[in-house]
Curated annotation (Swiss-Prot):
Enzyme Commission number: 1.17.7.3
Tagged with keyword DNA damage: no
Domain of life: Bacteria
Record's protein name: 4-hydroxy-3-methylbut-2-en-1-yl diphosphate synthase (flavodoxin)
Record-linked PANTHER family: 4-HYDROXY-3-METHYLBUT-2-EN-1-YL DIPHOSPHATE SYNTHASE, 4-HYDROXY-3-METHYLBUT-2-EN-1-YL DIPHOSPHATE SYNTHASE (FERREDOXIN), CHLOROPLASTIC
Positions annotated to bind [4Fe-4S] cluster: C268, C271, C303, E310
Length: 370
């Protein structure tokens, strides 16, 4: 059996201003729910996704109106844009002409070789990568006939078939996804893919469900895959506002220490000792830190006895007691604050630490560029 390719060993592929693969960073992706030809609505949704922490966004391109809108959308957003293309190679060509940053296709359903070659040549000329999207629900007929039903081996065979089409045209800026709605199938498919080739992998559990059920299902499947060192980009697919997809993705990556640009909240589950409204305070603080782009850890705890010790790894936190709270940094009590002002005091400290972290990151960036 081939050795599994860790995410840090995958081939680097440029997508806009991002490098996907060849490092330990996972890029968060989402997809718009608007009609792509409605430029105003699509841009507005992408702006909300950007603010939530989305790093790459995909749009459906089912017709010429959508393809023609790409250029206008690109002018108004700040993150790489991906075109989702099926069947009609001319839509891919139009999207590439409009400045798209990546194309998602299956070379096998684009048609004859000259059509695939036209897309590949256009992508080569612009330095645009292609994502091969393998999906358990739409495997080729000959693969289903061979295996009887969707299997991990069949999905890998499909991926290798599409990869070969591109490689035969001397195209190697490839990203691959191996999506399934069955969690165990997805885990097996991604693991086998990581043993079969070294192209970057885009992770996802497709058709995972509504906000609550889909979050649980995606976290279970993608968590197992991430823990194996697999994956370079990911999307949490939910039947919900796509901003929720980004929020869940950020939380999932934070859980594995794979998000260097997101704040983390530590809060206790509450018990009979609690004498403050911890749940509403935790929700307020979580919302406050949700858009921070630094790895600050914030703790909100209800017990002044155990709180600081339980969250000694937090950069800043509060532990509530009757009528007052303890403000602490790295487990050390800084000062006592009245209960009615402790949340505002915590927010002030968060702002100070976040600014310090941002300045330090900028300094490191300048040093690296010298």
């Amino acid at each position: 059996m081939n050795e599994m390719t860790h995410r840090t060993k995958t081939r680097p592929v440029k997508v806009g201003n991002l490098t996907i693969g060849g490092n330990n960073e996972l890029i968060i992706q989402s997809m718009t729910t608007t009609k792509t030809h409605d430029v105003e609505a699509t841009v507005a949704e992408i702006k909300r996704l950007e603010e939530a922490g989305c790093q790459v966004v995909r749009v459906a391109v089912p017709d010429e109106r959508a393809a023609d809108a790409i250029a206008d959308i690109k002018k108004q957003i700040n993150i790489p844009l991906v075109a989702d293309i099926h069947f009609d190679y001319r839509l891919a060509l139009k999207a590439i002409e409009g400045g798209i940053d990546k194309v998602r296709i299956n070379p096998g359903n684009i048609g004859r070789r000259h059509k695939v070659e036209a897309v590949v040549n256009a992508a080569k000329e612009r330095g645009i990568p292609i994502r091969i999207g393998v999906n358990a629900g739409s495997l080729e007929r000959h693969i289903l006939e061979k295996y009887g039903y969707p299997t991990a081996d069949g999905m890998v065979e499909s991926a290798l078939h599409h990869i070969k089409i591109l490689e035969d045209l001397d195209f190697h800026d490839i990203i691959v996804s191996m999506k399934a709605s069955d969690v165990n199938l997805a885990i097996e498919a991604y693991e086998k893919a990581a043993r079969a080739f070294d192209y970057p992998l885009h992770l996802g559990i497709t058709e995972s469900g509504t906000l609550f059920a889909g979050t649980v299902k995606s976290a279970a499947g993608l968590g197992a895959i991430l823990n194996k060192g697999i994956g370079n980009t990911l999307r949490i697919s939910l039947s919900a506002d796509p901003v929720e997809e980004v929020k869940v993705a950020r939380e999932l990556l934070k859980s594995f220490g794979l998000a260097s640009n997101a704040a983390t909240l530590i809060s206790c589950p509450t018990c009979g000792r609690i004498e403050i409204d911890l749940i509403s305070i935790a929700n307020e603080v979580e919302e406050y830190i949700s858009t921070l782009q630094v790895p600050i850890k914030v703790a909100v705890l209800g017990c002044a006895v155990n709180g600081p010790g339980e969250a000694r790894e937090a950069d800043i936190g509060i532990a509530g007691a009757r009528g007052e709270g303890l403000l602490f940094r790295k487990g050390q009590v800084v000062r006592k604050v009245p209960e009615e002002t402790m949340v505002e005091e915590l927010k002030k400290e968060i702002d100070v630490i976040a600014a310090e972290m941002a300045a330090e990151r900028e300094k490191e960036k300048e040093t690296q560029e010298q």
